Regions:
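An N-terminal JmjN-like helical accessory module and its immediate linker preceding a catalytic domain
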Residues: 1-140
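Conserved small/polar residues in nucleotide/adenosyl-binding loops
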Residues: 144-146
Length: 147
C-alpha cells in the first residue's frame, strides 16, 4: 500500500529499497490497528514486554540496546556545502562524499527484513511552519515511538 502519489517520495522509496534490498515494504498509515499489529510483533520478538494489564493498562517495557543509544561524536558529521556552516566544534564532511560512504554501508543492509516507510509532519499539518518528512527504517521500535 502506498500512501502517496508524490513521484519524489515514490522514487526515494524505490531507490532506498533497491539499495538496501528489503524482503518487503510496509507503509505506515498511523492507524490504531496498524500500531496494535506492530506492538504484537514487537512483543513476539522480545523487543517489547507487555506489562501487567490490570496495574498498567496499555503499557509496555522497552529496554534500549547499549549499542544503539548514544551518539558517538567521532562518527557524527554535519554535511554541508562549506566547512564553515558546520561550525568550529563539529566534524564536517562534504554531502556527496558522505552519500558515497553511506551507500556502501547501506548496500543490502535490510536483506531479509521489512522496510517501513513513515510519512510524518513536524508541526501542525497545513501550517506554513510545518515541516514534512519521510522516515525509512527497519526498526519496529522506531515506528512505535514515533506513533
Amino acid at each position: 500500500m502506498e500512501l502517496t502519489q508524490n513521484p519524489s517520495v515514490l522514487e526515494l522509496v524505490r531507490k532506498t529499497a533497491e539499495l538496501t534490498t528489503p524482503k518487503e515494504i510496509v507503509w505506515i498509515d498511523g492507524s490504531e490497528a496498524q500500531l496494535k499489529s506492530l506492538r504484537k510483533i514487537a512483543v513476539e520478538t522480545g523487543e517489547l514486554i507487555k506489562l501487567n494489564e490490570e496495574k498498567l493498562p496499555g503499557c509496555y517495557l522497552n529496554r534500549s540496546d547499549v549499542n544503539d543509544v548514544a551518539r558517538v561524536e567521532g562518527r557524527t558529521f554535519i554535511c554541508s556545502r562549506t566547512r564553515e556552516e558546520a561550525g568550529p566544534t563539529n566534524n564536517w564532511m562534504d554531502p556527496d562524499e558522505m552519500k558515497a560512504k553511506l551507500h556502501e554501508i547501506l548496500r543490502g543492509a535490510m536483506a531479509g527484513r521489512t522496510m517501513y516507510v513513515i510519512p510524518y509532519a513536524m508541526g501542525v499539518i497545513g501550517s506554513p511552519f510545518a515541516k514534512y518528512g519521510i522516515e525509512v527504517t527497519d526498526s519496529i521500535l522506531s515506528l512505535i515511538h514515533i506513533s
